[in-house]
Amino acid sequence: MRQQISQVPIQPLNRESGPTLAWMVVLAVARAAEQAARENRRIAFTLADDDELRGIRDDDPDAVVAWQPSHGWICLLPADDDRRALIDLYLPVCSATAVHPVTVGHLGESLDGFIATHTGDSQWVTGPENVVHMHRLRALCDAVVVGAGTVAADDPQLTTRLVPGRNPLRVVLDPGRRLRDDHRVFQDDGSDTLYVCARELVEPGERRFGSAEVFGVSGTGDGLDLHELIGALRARGCSRIFVEGGGVTVSTFLQADLLDRLHLAIAPLLIGDGRAAIRLPPPVALGDCHRPAYRVFRMGGDVLFDCDLRSRLDDFPSGDEDRTIARII
C-alpha cells in the first residue's frame, strides 16, 4: 500500500495563513476544553474573529472541530485541508481536563537512538521545526518538566518565545542538588519556576533558589518520587504536564507509568554512540515490550511519532488501522 506522511507546517506566517490560523484553533480548543467537557454533549465549533471558539452546526462548512464526551476534541476539516495535520497533532493534549489530565513526554533523537554525543553535545539533533513543536507543547501545557542534566547542558529558558501562547510553570528536577542557581531558568522572570529536590536536602526555612520556589518531595534512593510530584502539580491546577527531557528524566517517567503520550522526533542523523534517548529495564522477550498505538507526522526533515501509551496496537482489530495510524508512511 502506498502511504504518506503528513507535513506539519511550522513557519511563522501572517494571521490569515494556514499554519497560523491552525495554531490559533489549537490554542482556542485548549482553552475551551473544560467548558466543553462540562456540557457533556457533542458540540461543533468554528474559530471566531476574536480567536475564541463559537458553537456551530456540525454540517456547517465553517465547522473546524467538535467535542465528543467519550473522546475529546476531533477535527472536522477535510483530509486535504492544509490546516488539518497541525490541528490533529495537538488535539489529544488539548483534550485534557482536570478530570482527565494528560502528561506528555518528548525526545528528539538520531536514527540510532541517541539524543546527544558522549560529551553531551545536543544542539541540535533535530531540526528547527521540532524546536517550534516543543515551544507549542510548552504553550499548551500548564507545566514543563526537565531534569538537572538538561539545565546543566543546555541552560534552557523553557518559554514560548517562538509561538503565541502563555509560558508554563517551569519545573526543574534536581534530586541531589547539583545545579547552581545562576542558570537562566532560576534568574529570569519569564515564568514561575519550581526547583524540585529531595525533601531532606531542603534547609529549614529555605524557600527560594535564585528566583525559583524550592519544593521538596520524597527521595527514592536514586531519584524522586514522581507520583508525589505529579500529585502536587495536579493540586496546583496542572492538567497538562509536558516532560521535555532529557533522556534520563523521560525514561524515569516512562518507567513509573506516568506518561500518557510520548512524542519521539527522529532525525536523519547517525551519532554512533552517545547519550541514549530511552533506557528501561531489559525485557525477557519482545512479547513483554510495549507496542503503543501511534500516529506519524513529518516536521521538516524529521519524523515525529505521537505514541498513545494508554493503548496498544493489538487492542485494535485487524483492518482497523485508520483508528491507530492517522498519518501513515
Task: Map each language-model feature to its residues.
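Enzymes that bind and transform nitrogen-containing heteroaromatic metabolites
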Residues: 1-329
